[in-house]
Amino acid sequence: MKLKILLHSSTYSSSFDTEEQQLPGPSTSYSEVTEQASPTRRRKPRKSDATSTTSPETEGVRLRRRRREGKSGPGSGETPRKRRRGGGRGGGETELGSAPSPAEVGSRHRQVERQGLSRLGLLQAEARDPPMILLKGTANSLKCWRYRKVNSNCCNFLFMSTVWNWVGDCSHNHSRMLIAFDSTDQRDAFVKHNLFPKLCTYTYGSLNSL
């Protein structure tokens, strides 16, 4: 009986050893699977990969630049020149003429158009047509006034005529006297700083020549 038990225990232990030997150990494929299943590291985005976002203000500036380039024309490096146009009847460009020659002084018999002319151009145009003042009054008052102005060394006029009258004019203030000036500025200064005789009227005008 004892022999049977010993034999049975020996066979059981030997079979247990063989089973332990047949158990599969940890294979290398399992380690590879675990390594593959491990989470991979994420790549940090580079500066070149990041998309550049533009603000709406910069987009508006770009659109305005494109519109300006479209209006001025592509490839036009020069800005359009501004032309100054006069307000006269012709509507053409205002060009500053040359200074009048001595023969051209007083050659114009029409009033100068002031629109579209610079100060220098206006003076040059008026030099061809000397401005004048026509005084109307009594003969005695005009003669006395002229005598005082001539003897006072008043140099703010060009010429002063004698007292004259139209033939057939029998009115009370029938006497006339002409005063010529170099420019309208001189004429305006003369009217501003001088008093005319009592009950005397004046008017502006110009002559073809003196």
UniProtKB/Swiss-Prot annotation:
Ion transport in keyword set: no
Domain of life: Viruses
Polar residues composition-biased segments: 24-39
MF annotations from Gene Ontology: DNA binding; DNA-binding transcription factor activity
SUPFAM superfamilies cross-referenced by the UniProt entry: Viral DNA-binding domain
UniProt main location, coarse: host cell
Record family assignment: Belongs to the papillomaviridae E8^E2C protein family.
Function in brief: Plays a role in limiting the replication of viral DNA in keratinocytes. Recruits the host NCoR/SMRT complex to viral replication foci to mediate repression of both viral replication and transcription.
Organism: Human papillomavirus 4
Keyword Secreted: no
GO cellular component terms attached to this protein's record: host cell nucleus
Region (Disordered), start-end ranges: 1-112
Name of this protein: Protein E8^E2C
Matching InterPro entries: E2/EBNA1_C_sf (IPR035975), Nucleotide-bd_a/b_plait_sf (IPR012677), Papillomavirus_E2_C (IPR000427)
Subcellular location field: Host nucleus
